Structure formats: structure tokens, C-alpha cells
């Protein structure tokens, strides 16, 4: 939120610099994201008085002699402007000066005549008419006659000011205004707060009755309105235009500016209805009817439903409550009577409507954080005072104040100094705490038993209990007073990673060593992602938890698989020209026992890996899994299984110690054909995906992997070419070979052959075996005995013959 330094000074007698105030605001919990000097980029620009003028023959230029006081009384400058006269004072950029945008002015010849600077327009100084009158005139900016030559230009045109861009946290909606920040400035400086004038006088009776009603008090706890007749549209005074301009708003007309000024100054959104356009002279705050439509002031049409709160006349909606008025009730040059409204709307209602319709405004931004029930009273009074001050309408006696029935009263918190200090962990003198709370407009009534009855200001709806009082005390007292200490009962532990974190880090390093990069995706997606993978309706992955108020339908459910997100990442890479890569993600998936959920879902840690590129194949992923298994001292078994999104002939399930960990394989052809990538990419790409239950994987790990010395004896190698049926998997053969003897230290498949000489439904698989014994050399007799046993087991269990 932007707050001008000069505007704050109207509320508080500030005796510190803007930079010092920035530090003080930060110390009491308000981050100034940027302190913006209005004269940023301007240097050596002063007031110059034109003392001589002469038209430069044959050109459009005028040669001027300018009096710049101490900088020189006869500085010769040529200009192309024509709106000045002898004796005028104008902004003068001297030789070596700078202007906004990084422009540097140097002495140079113009049409053969030496010019020692530049005479400036308002635009060249970054000004507009709202900041300084005459700034948008074509030509030079003419300064007041009493300007003193040689004076720095900034204070003359109002550029000696700063804008505080302050980040307002969600728990402090009362600070969404200049007044709100001024309250904090007054407290931190120990200065009195000068409230803006809010008195007004009704000068006439209404000319016709108006009906105002609230049908949804749960969404509109307070609705105030006041009728003003004989509206006189005109221009706003200079001070109001400047206030608006410093906050980034342009002046429109006196009445419109009053509503915007009240929003900025008091933090109270306002709207004014042209009663000549309000059917039946009726205002009704209610839920929208299904299918109702409204066109807002920015000429956008929306279709509404009962979740949207609207303000209606006798026939139709005329405003989206808390967001924006309707084009059918806005002010124009023919407006003669207005109903000014100030209200408190439920923040959730405004937020949901704003998100659902995609419609935001300065008003909705404030309502979403919260506007207290006291605010409409102050805002409306201030607006009516300004109407009277600017004489832009006649205030009638007709006013409305409709509430939900709750009394408007201060919150009372009973606390003791010991409780407050107990929260802070330090001792703050009682009187110091009382002084701080009183500066923040709390009242403190000290009871006979030593307790305090503290009442919070009406605008501080965030204050609930004594810890909130402790926060108020410490942010004014100073966080630097808190001394770090250990609790008496606390134990000191060394920092570092716990066991689970170490195992996760090890997993990531093992995969990184295989050329995989870590991906990080959102925990939400939509049913479209599950549809993309052809997940059947009865699959457990379809039992996804739906978000009550999703940011968008694309992020409407909590993920039950990581694979959809991984495939999206791969597709994004392909679209952007990255033709190959290896990725992994380790993150939780959210599994509900039943829907709708009545207990916290299981957040299962899951590992997903993906590889894509023309050279990638099934063994890329299998090799990464083998490296992972070896890193944890495990052995993976593989069985022929598939999933809805995998190619049925190029996929497998991973098992360890009899536990099913997950599946991996090539992306199914039909899914690959549906991907939104170029056809040539679909034809040349190989996409492989795998998803493992990481918790099940870690349950197979038995403590730390211990070093096993290599056998000092050379292993004996044997190759076996085996003929088997097409249905027999490599994993089944490997498992049978390994179980035949402890001397088998390594089994590797190195060839697969299919041919007519083998017979129908047959294939040949060639394996390389390593046999070793850590205690001695393996004899030829032992090798023959082991090989014989292996062949016997293969024939008995799998019907396999030696080729």
C-alpha cells in the first residue's frame, strides 16, 4: 500500500526524516518494501527566471538568458517551446544535470548556437496536472511568479516528498489506509494523532422516500447509507488531486474523487448510486439469483449465482457487493441525487466472489483482508464532511444504519502484567506497558487484585486475548530487548539431519549420480490429469480429495499419484525444445480412506522417476532402480505387471523382500499419441515413467549399509544361453539363478534372441554369471556343480533348456 509522507504529516507532527521513519515502522512490524523519493533521478534542476528572449533566425528555437541565482545570472539556453514570456520562472536543467529516466543534460550547440542547459516541461520532471497544475501543458512548466531563482526545483513543484510502499499483513486490516498507518506512526513517535474532520450538517429534507434493506445480514453485518441531493459535479481541489495522484489514482470529478479519497484515507470502500437510475428508489442487499447478470463499471458482464452477494434495486443487481458497482447505476454529468453507501461485507464472501468471477478492485482487496464494523461510520462521516466542504451537494436528513443486531462495543481482555511478560520471556515495567497500550488507543483499567481490564479499540478486531496484548507491547517496546535464553528444562541437541532426512538425501544423490535432475511440482492437479493417464474410474487413484475453494479448476484436487505431474513436466520440456532428460521427484501423495473425508488422509511419501529422449529405453529406468537398490544394500525383483498408463509389453513391477514397491515402464502408445506435442516428437520420443512407494522401500532397509570387503580371489565367469517361453521374464530367471548357490555374486543379461530355429513362442536369453568365494578360489568342480544345479532348477521351475 502506498502512503505519501506529506499526507502522514497532516495526521502526525513528524519530527524525523522519511528514512528514520522507515526504520521505526519496520521495528514495530511494518515492512516498508520501498521508500520512493519523488525527485528520484533529478539533480541540478533549479528555478530559472527568463530575463532575455530572442527568436533564433531560420529556426523554431528561442534564445533565452536565464537568471538561476547562485548558479549564474546570465545562463544562455535555447528552447523549442513557445508558451513562455519575459519574466516567467521555469524549471532549468543546468549543464551536468539529470532527469528521470537516466537522461543527462550537457551543454551543446543547437542550430549553431551554444545552449548551456535545458528549460523543462512538467512531463520531463515526471509531473502531471494532478501533482502540479500546468504540468501537462504543451511547452514549458510555468512556475509561480514568486519563485526564487536558483532554488532547487523539488520543493517548488512538490517533489520534496516520499512514498512509503508498505506491506500490510493479513492480521492488520485496520492499517489499509493512511489513517491506519498514521495511528502507528503517532504511537511509535509518541505524538498525538490529529483525526481528519468528520463533522457535517444536514441542510435539507429528502424529496422522495428511499427503501434500504439487507436480506443477508450474515454476509453484510453493517450497511450505512446517506442521501445527498442537488449534486454539483465539478473539479476537485488541488490538495485532493495531489493526494490521489501520490497514491496512483487520477482525478475524475469532485464526487468520484471523494469516494476514492475516503477509501485511501479512511480505508473504507464507498460507492455512490445515482438514484435517477435506481429502479423503485430501492436498495436491497441480498444473494444473487441463479443466472442473474450484471455489467460492472469496467463494462464486463458476469453471470451470478446465490454464492454471490449483490446490491440490487427493485428490478436488477446494481453492484457486486464489496467489489465494483454496476454500469447501470454509476454517476455521470446528469447525476442530481446520490445515495452514498458504506458497509462491512464478510471477507470470505467477497474473496470467493472475486476469485470465482476473476474480478478484483481496490475495494475487494480491502474487504478480503477485513473491514471492521466501526469503519463505515467513520468513512461515511468523512465523505459527507468533504461533500459539504467542497460544496458538491446538499446533505439531507435521510440516513440508514442497518446491522446484524450485534452491539458495537470494545473487546475486553482480562490479563495480568505477569501473563504478558510470561509470553515475552522478559520483564517489562508495568507503567511502560500501560503507556504503550494507551498510545495504541487501548484503555487499561487496573483492578484491585492487580489484574488489568484492557479494552481494544473498535477497529482492532484482530485482538482476542492477552498474547495479542503481549505482541502490541513488544513491537513498540522493541524486539531488541528480547535476550535469547534456554528454558530451564530444555535439552541442547546438535543440529543436523535426522535419519529420514539422511535417507532422502542419499536417495536423491544416488539418482543424481545416474544423471537425474530433481523436479518439484504442485501438490494439486485436476481430474484431467488422471484422465490423461487413462486411470479407470474404479482405481484407488480416483479417490482424490477435492479442494473446497480451489484457485482454479486446474488445481482442484490433491494428488494421488506423482506420475501425472511428471508427465506434464516432460511435455513442457518437449514443447520448449528440450528433447531429452532424466527427472525424479520425491513428494507426498494424499490418500483418503473414504470420500468425503472424515479424518486426515495418509500422506504417503512417493518416488517418481521419468526419462525421455530418443536414446532412452526400459533399461535406463531399470538401471537407475538397480543403482538405488545397490546404494541401500537391497535386491530388487521384477515381475511382469503393468499400469493403465504403461505399455503392457514394456513394463514391470518392482518387488523387494516380497513387498510390491511400484511399477515402471514405457508410456502407453495411445497416451503418447494424445500428448500435445509435435508429431515428429511423438514419433521419435521414448518416454519412460516409474512410481514407487518410498515408505515401503525404506521399510526394506535394515540399518546402515556396512562395508563388505571384496574377495581377494578372482571371480570365475560363465555364460549361459537359455531357451525359454516368451512368457518367462528376465526377473524370474535371475531370481532362480541367484537362489541356486551363494557363490553366484553377479548375474547380467547381455543378449536376447528370437528366431525360427528356436520354435514358435520361444526366445533365447544369454546371461553372464560371476562366481566367487571371499575365503578361497572357486574350483572348476565347484563351478560345474553350481552350473548343473542352476540348469536343473531352471528346467524344473521354468521349463528352460540350455541352448
PLM regions with names:
Residues 5, 23, 53-55, 189, ...:
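Glycine/proline-enriched, intrinsically flexible loops and inter-domain linkers
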Residues 413-579, 718, 770-774, 782-803:
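Extended, well-folded interaction surfaces typified by the phenylalanyl-tRNA synthetase beta subunit core
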Residues 2, 20, 27, 439-442, ...:
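A carboxyl-terminal module marker
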Residues 185, 189-214, 391-420:
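Terminal amphipathic helices with adjacent charged low-complexity linkers/tails
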Residues 114-130, 135-140, 154, 162, ...:
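Mobile "lid/hinge" segments at catalytic clefts and subdomain interfaces of large enzymes
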Residues 33, 47-78, 242, 246, ...:
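Conserved mixed alpha/beta core segments that line enzyme active sites in large multi-domain catalysts
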Residues 39-43, 200-202, 455, 491-492, ...:
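Beta-rich nucleic-acid/ligand-interaction surfaces
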Residues 1-202, 206, 339, 358, ...:
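Phosphate-backbone binding interfaces of nucleic-acid-interacting proteins
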Amino acid at each position: 500500500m502506498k502512503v505519501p509522507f506529506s499526507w502522514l504529516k497532516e495526521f502526525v507532527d513528524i519530527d524525523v526524516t522519511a528514512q528514520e521513519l522507515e526504520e521505526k515502522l519496520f521495528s514495530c512490524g511494518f515492512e516498508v518494501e520501498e521508500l520512493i523519493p519523488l525527485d528520484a533521478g533529478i539533480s541540478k534542476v533549479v528555478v530559472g527566471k527568463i530575463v532575455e528572449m530572442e527568436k533564433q533566425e531560420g529556426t523554431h528555437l528561442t534564445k533565452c538568458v536565464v537568471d538561476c541565482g547562485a548558479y549564474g545570472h546570465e545562463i544562455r539556453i535555447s528552447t523549442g517551446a513557445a508558451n513562455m514570456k519575459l519574466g516567467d520562472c521555469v524549471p532549468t536543467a543546468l549543464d551536468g544535470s539529470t532527469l528521470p529516466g537516466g537522461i543527462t543534460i550537457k551543454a551543446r550547440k543547437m542550430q549553431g548556437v551554444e545552449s548551456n542547459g535545458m528549460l523543462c516541461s512538467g512531463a520531463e520532471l515526471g509531473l502531471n496536472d494532478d501533482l502540479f497544475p500546468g504540468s501537462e501543458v504543451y511547452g514549458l512548466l510555468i512556475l509561480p511568479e514568486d519563485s526564487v531563482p536558483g532554488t532547487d526545483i523539488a520543493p517548488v513543484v512538490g517533489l520534496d516528498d516520499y512514498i512509503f510502499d508498505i506491506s500490510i499483513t493479513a492480521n492488520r486490516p485496520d492499517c489499509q489506509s493512511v489513517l491506519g498507518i498514521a495511528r502507528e506512526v503517532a504511537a511509535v513517535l509518541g505524538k498525538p494523532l490529529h483525526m481528519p474532520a468528520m463533522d457535517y450538517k444536514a441542510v435539507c429534507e429528502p424529496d422522495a422516500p428511499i427503501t434500504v434493506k439487507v436480506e443477508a445480514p450474515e454476509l453484510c453485518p453493517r450497511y450505512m447509507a446517506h442521501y445527498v441531493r442537488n449534486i454539483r459535479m465539478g473539479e476537485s481541489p488541488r490538495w485532493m488531486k495531489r493526494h490521489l495522484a501520490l497514491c496512483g489514482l487520477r482525478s475524475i470529478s469532485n464526487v468520484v474523487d471523494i469516494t476514492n479519497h475516503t477509501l485511501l484515507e479512511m480505508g473504507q470502500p464507498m460507492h455512490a448510486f445515482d438514484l435517477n437510475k435506481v429502479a423503485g428508489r430501492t436498495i436491497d442487499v441480498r444473494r444473487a439469483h441463479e443466472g442473474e447478470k450484471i455489467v460492472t463499471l469496467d463494462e464486463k458482464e458476469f453471470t451470478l449465482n446465490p454464492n454471490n452477494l449483490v446490491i440490487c434495486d427493485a428490478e436488477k443487481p446494481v453492484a457486486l457487493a464489496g467489489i465494483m458497482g454496476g454500469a447501470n447505476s454509476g454517476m455521470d454529468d446528469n447525476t442530481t441525487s446520490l445515495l452514498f453507501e458504506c458497509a462491512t461485507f464478510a471477507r470470505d464472501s467477497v474473496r470467493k466472489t472475486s476469485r470465482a468471477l476473476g474480478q478484483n478492485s481496490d475495494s475487494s482487496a480491502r474487504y478480503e483482508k477485513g473491514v471492521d464494523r466501526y469503519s463505515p461510520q467513520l468513512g461515511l462521516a468523512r465523505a459527507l464532511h468533504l461533500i459539504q466542504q467542497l460544496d458538491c451537494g446538499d446533505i439531507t436528513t435521510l440516513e440508514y444504519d442497518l446491522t446484524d443486531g450485534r452491539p458495537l462495543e470494545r473487546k475486553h481482555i482480562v490479563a495480568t502484567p505477569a501473563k504478558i511478560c510470561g509470553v515475552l520471556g522478559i520483564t517489562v515495567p508495568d507503567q511502560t506497558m500501560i503507556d504503550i497500550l494507551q498510545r495504541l488507543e487501548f484503555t487499561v483499567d487496573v483492578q484491585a487484585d492487580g489484574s488489568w481490564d484492557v479494552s481494544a479499540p473498535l477497529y482492532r478486531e484482530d485482538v482476542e486475548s492477552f498474547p495479542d496484548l503481549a505482541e502490541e507491547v513488544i513491537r513498540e517496546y522493541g524486539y531488541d530487548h528480547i535476550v535469547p535464553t534456554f528454558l530451564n528444562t530444555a535439552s541442547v541437541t546438535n543440529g543436523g539431519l535426522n535419519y529420514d532426512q539422511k535417507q532422502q538425501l542419499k536417495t536423491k544423490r544416488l539418482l543424481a549420480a545416474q544423471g537425474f535432475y530433481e523436479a518439484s511440482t504442485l501438490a494439486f492437479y485436476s481430474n484431467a490429469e488422471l484422465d490423461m493417464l487413462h486411470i479407470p474410474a474404479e482405481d484407488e487413484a480416483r479417490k482424490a480429495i477435492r479442494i473446497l475453494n480451489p484457485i482454479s479448476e486446474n488445481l482442484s484436487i490433491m494428488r494421488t499419484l506423482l506420475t501425472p505431474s511428471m508427465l506434464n513436466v516432460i511435455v513442457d520440456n518437449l514443447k520448449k525444445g528440450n528433447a531429452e532428460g532424466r527427472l525424479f521427484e520425491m513428494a507426498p501423495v494424499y490418500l483418503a480412506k473414504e470420500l468425503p473425508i472424515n479424518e486426515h488422509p495418509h500422506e504417503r511419501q512417493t518416488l517418481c522417476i521419468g526419462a525421455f529422449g530418443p536414446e532412452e529405453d526400459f533399461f535406463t529406468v531399470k538401471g537407475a532402480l538397480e543403482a538405488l537398490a545397490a546404494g541401500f544394500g537391497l535386491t530388487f525383483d521384477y515381475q511382469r505387471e503393468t499400469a493403465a498408463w504403461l505399455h503392457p509389453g514394456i513394463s514391470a513391477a518392482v518387488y523387494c523382500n516380497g513387498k510390491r514397491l511400484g511399477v515402471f515402464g514405457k508410456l502407453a502408445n495411445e497416451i503418447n499419441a494424445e500428448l500435445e506435442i509435435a508429431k515428429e516428437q511423438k514419433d521419435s520420443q521414448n518416454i519412460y515413467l516409474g512410481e514407487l512407494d518410498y515408505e515401503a522401500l525404506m521399510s526394506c532397509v535394515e540399518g546402515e549399509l556396512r562395508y563388505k570387503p571384496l574377495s581377494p580371489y578372482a571371480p570365475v565367469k560363465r555364460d549361459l544361453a537359455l531357451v525359454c517361453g516368451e512368457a518367462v521374464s528376465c526377473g524370474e530367471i535371475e531370481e532362480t539363478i541367484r537362489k541356486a548357490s551363494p557363490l553366484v555374486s553377479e548375474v547380467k543379461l547381455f543378449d536376447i534372441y528370437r528366431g525360427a530355429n528356436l520354435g514358435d513362442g520361444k526366445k533365447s536369453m544369454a546371461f553372464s554369471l560371476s562366481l566367487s568365494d571371499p575365503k578361497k578360489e572357486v574350483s572348476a568342480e565347484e563351478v560345474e556343480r553350481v552350473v548343473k544345479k542352476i540348469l536343473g532348477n531352471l528346467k524344473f521351475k521354468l521349463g528352460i533348456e540350455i541352448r
